[in-house]
A protein has these predicted regions:
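Catalytic cores of the polymerase beta-like nucleotidyltransferase superfamily
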Residues: 1-463, 468-470, 477-480
């Protein structure tokens, strides 16, 4: 592990002042898992808060966070704190009375941590590992275990953390910890904390399905995600979905989607993963036996309302200026379109793809639809029977040929062009620009000159239909 010089220098000064600075939590865990940490947490023993602040001020700007208990942030990736005592003081995962106590023992300080793998400390100067709860043993066994059965349930967020750690590290949650999690009331958790753990589960895990199925096993779904709970045991036609029910299909789809997003910016990664997770939310309400077969007709449209409810619960709107919410809803509504277009590929005109690009980003739709198509890999079904994305590959190639994979075409004709032609401001300008844009989507207008020519035809028709000619501001309209 490459420990930053800033951390080493702080540890040296703390040592010289009679204290001890120890790395703790995720950075130690990551090193033991052969991962380079991105964030660093340092716990300082034997130094009182005023003296610690004086020490830290030597190493740059210090941002003090917390009222009852102080965390000193030095930049985006280094937190320094004192060991602390916590006492539950009410309902809610943040309802604790917290007191910093630099004289605590390491064993007492680490009792408050969630899992044994996060309760390992390291001296950055001597490389000594301090492991009071056998976290290294659990790391080696790929086991997630609660540090303290007595206090684990005091922080309800730990249930979601258990699922996301299990997904990210592909660990098992040991049985006692499962039993600790299942009865915990999660209604105190705010949306931003729920999403914080779900975001890690969906984006940081290579197989998010592991974490999602742990949410089921830990009894989280009926409390927080009834839309996901509703997918369990919803049947599917074996010919199309040999993998099993809609829940199993959703887990497989999410894993296939996760494989497709590493080249995307963060907001679009979130969009694809949420759309993959929500894409069949309409099936519980639409699935029925029709002519002896299981059908889920119009489940795409039927999934819009539960998707909105799901996004509302997580408070998902825009991320970094990107309208994740609108895109997810559109992707759910249109996730079958690539396959439908492929089936009618000899009839589908360019305008259909251009118009679809106005509703959602076709590159993202391709990824969601492909994940949906490939999310059918039952172990007993030969690969060639399910690994087929011919329709989706055709769809994205055609979208790229039309240059609409990322966005719909920008309009060629704007209102200012009509004003330049002599029209007076008014609602007719919007009507004409819209009509010309529809021609553009159909490929009938490809340049500004052609757009102006078509606009003149519309204006001429307006003039001819007008008894007194007042709809045309002046004759100059037709001469430009």
């Amino acid at each position: 592990m490459d420990i930053p010089d800033q951390v080493l220098n702080i540890a040296r000064v703390v040592r010289d002042e009679g204290g001890r600075a120890l790395l703790v939590g995720g950075c130690v865990r990551d090193e033991l898992m052969d991962k380079q940490p991105k964030d660093w947490d340092v716990e300082v023993y034997g130094i009182q808060p005023p003296q610690l602040r004086e020490i830290l001020d030597q190493f740059g700007s210090v941002n003090v966070v917390g009222e009852a208990f102080t965390v000193y942030k030095l930049g985006a990736h280094l937190d320094v704190s004192l060991p602390r005592r916590e006492r539950k003081a009410g309902r809610g995962h943040r309802a604790f009375v917290i007191e910093g106590d630099p004289m605590m023992s390491v064993a007492d300080a680490t009792k408050r941590r969630d899992f044994t793998i996060n309760a390992i400390l390291k001296d950055p100067l001597t490389a000594e590992i301090i492991d009071p709860f056998q976290g290294r043993t659990d790391l080696a066994a790929k086991n997630l275990r609660a540090v303290s059965p007595e206090t684990f349930a005091e922080d309800s967020l730990r249930v979601l953390r258990a699922a996301q750690f299990a997904a990210r590290f592909e660990f098992e949650i040991e049985p006692l910890t499962v039993e600790l999690c299942r009865p915990i009331d999660l209604s105190d958790l705010p949306a931003e904390r729920i999403w914080g753990e779900m975001e890690k589960l969906l984006l940081r895990a290579q197989c998010p399905s592991i974490g999602l199925d742990w949410l089921r096993k830990l009894a989280v779904l009926p409390q927080l995600f009834p839309e996901l709970e509703a997918l369990i045991d919803v049947p599917q036609e074996v010919e199309w979905h040999p993998e099993g029910d809609v829940w199993i299909h959703t887990l497989l789809t999410v894993d296939r989607a996760r494989e497709s997003i590493d080249d995307l910016p963060y907001p679009k990664q979130v969009t694809v993963m949420l759309a993959a997770l929500c894409h069949d939310f309409g099936k519980p309400a639409t699935t029925a036996f029709v002519d002896g077969r299981i059908r889920s007709r119009e489940h795409e449209e039927g999934g819009v309302r539960p998707t909105i409810d799901f996004l509302d619960r997580l408070n998902i709107y825009t991320l970094d200026g990107y309208d994740v919410r609108a895109q997810v809803i559109a992707l759910v509504r249109d996730h079958l379109k690539p396959g439908e277009f492929y089936k009618k590929r000899d009839e589908v005109g360019d305008g259909a793809l251009r118009r679809l690009a106005r509703k959602c980003e076709l590159d993202l739709l391709y990824r969601v639809a492909k994940a949906d198509s490939l999310g059918r890999n039952a172990e007993w079904v030969p690969r060639e029977k399910w690994y087929n994305a011919e329709a989706q590959d055709w769809f994205i190639e055609r979208a790229r040929e039309l240059d609409v994979a990322a966005s719909a075409p920008s309009p060629i004709l704007f209102g200012r062009h009509l004003l330049e032609m002599g029209m007076q401001p008014g609602p007719r300008i919007g009507e004409i620009t819209k009509a010309i844009y529809e021609m553009q989507l159909d490929g009938r207008v490809t340049s500004l000159d052609e757009a102006r020519a078509e606009a003149k035809k519309i204006l001429s028709a307006d003039y001819a239909d007008s008894a007194d000619g007042n709809e045309i501001p002046n004759a100059r309209d037709l001469s430009h």
